[in-house]
Regions:
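Aliphatic-rich helix starts adjacent to a transmembrane/signal segment
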Residues: 22, 26-60
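N-terminal single-pass transmembrane signal-anchor helix
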Residues: 4-29
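Short beta-strand micro-motifs enriched in acidic
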Residues: 184-188
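A domain-level signal for the mature, folded cores of soluble proteins
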Residues: 59-179, 189-304
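Actinobacteria-biased recognition of intrinsically disordered, low-complexity terminal regions
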Residues: 1-5, 55-57
Length: 304
């Protein structure tokens, strides 16, 4: 990821020169300007125009859907995607792509678009359980009360857990794969994170501790949680990363700062999902987010 940071430094320096020249021109023309505020506004516009951050244009839409405070938090907490080595798939907008061919990107480096120039995309659902702000129809009982939940959903045209294993055939394969990562923001400002993985949720732990959750075997999952081997219902501290397994796209929140295939969070195109959930007539082999239990119960332990 360092290469993008280096490139961004050069672009940022160039942008500052442009901003400075603009401000000098205004001053020379005798126009009074609010210094820092205008500089920031101009810089933001140039960044978007230069496409340095693919997701920078999302914020107005997010604010319109969720209000200024929550809309900005949705943009801020979108994690960076870290893809397993050798994988090609990236999450896309299902309304524009539902085949493997249009949903594949480069095998390494910075990935922000597919080879057919579709943006890396995540859909957003917000469950607000803060006092006086409760989302209508959701479960905000018990420990949920006071929390703000941000759900980011990713769509892939298919899932193949055993892709590349000749003897497996079609086993483990299905069309329409919905995965995602969720954040729980507590009243004290602390943030938890968990990622969908097969039948449950995981966060930053070695796979052996998550077998019960992945397989949907309640006693194994509950035993691991009772022993403190994993967080309850897969929650753990926010890392700002979503690790995506190849083939199955099962997730985890591994804190990986060095990967050869990644998408920075700020370059993921974000789309509010609430209106789509009420109007979409699309059919899926796997239940879409709005038909999953966690859509209304943000502490649900399963992914169905």
């Amino acid at each position: 990821m360092d290469s993008e940071r280096g490139q961004g430094t050069v672009e940022w320096a160039g942008m500052l020169c442009v901003v400075s020249l603009l401000l000098l021109g205004l001053v020379a023309a005798g126009i009074r300007v609010p210094r820092a505020e205008l500089a920031q506004a101009v810089a933001d516009r140039i960044l978007c125009a230069a496409a340095l951050a693919d997701g920078c244009g999302d914020e107005p839409t997010l604010i319109a859907a969720y209000g200024s405070e929550v809309g900005e938090m949705v943009r801020e907490h979108m994690p960076s995607l870290v893809f397993e080595q050798g994988s090609r798939a990236v999450p896309v907008d299902f309304r524009r792509c539902r085949s493997t061919e249009c949903g594949e990107g480069p095998e390494d480096g910075l990935v922000h678009r597919t080879e057919e120039h579709l943006p890396v995309t995540a859909f957003v659902h917000v469950v607000d359980c803060r006092e006086g702000e409760e989302t209508e129809g959701v479960d905000c009982s018990g420990d949920r009360a006071g929390n703000l939940y941000l759900q980011y959903w990713t769509y892939y045209a298919d899932s193949a857990t055993l892709r590349g294993v000749p003897i497996a055939g079609a086993k483990g394969y299905h069309h329409d794969d919905w995965e995602g990562v969720q954040f729980r923001i507590r009243p004290d400002g602390s943030v938890d994170e968990r990622a969908s993985s097969h039948n449950g949720y995981n966060s930053g732990l070695e796979s052996s501790r998550n077998w019960g959750s992945d397989a949907g075997i309640g006693p194994l999952k509950e035993g691991a949680e009772a022993l403190g081997a994993r967080g309850v219902n897969g929650w753990g501290p926010e890392t700002g990363y979503l690790f995506v397994s190849g083939g199955s796209h099962a997730g985890n929140t591994f804190d990986l700062t060095d990967s050869n295939r990644y998408t920075p969070g700020r370059r993921v195109h974000l789309i509010p999902l609430e209106d789509i959930a009420t109007t979409s007539t699309a059919h899926f082999a796997i239940s879409p987010p709005w038909l999953k239990e966690v859509w209304l119960d943000p502490e649900a332990e399963g992914t169905s």
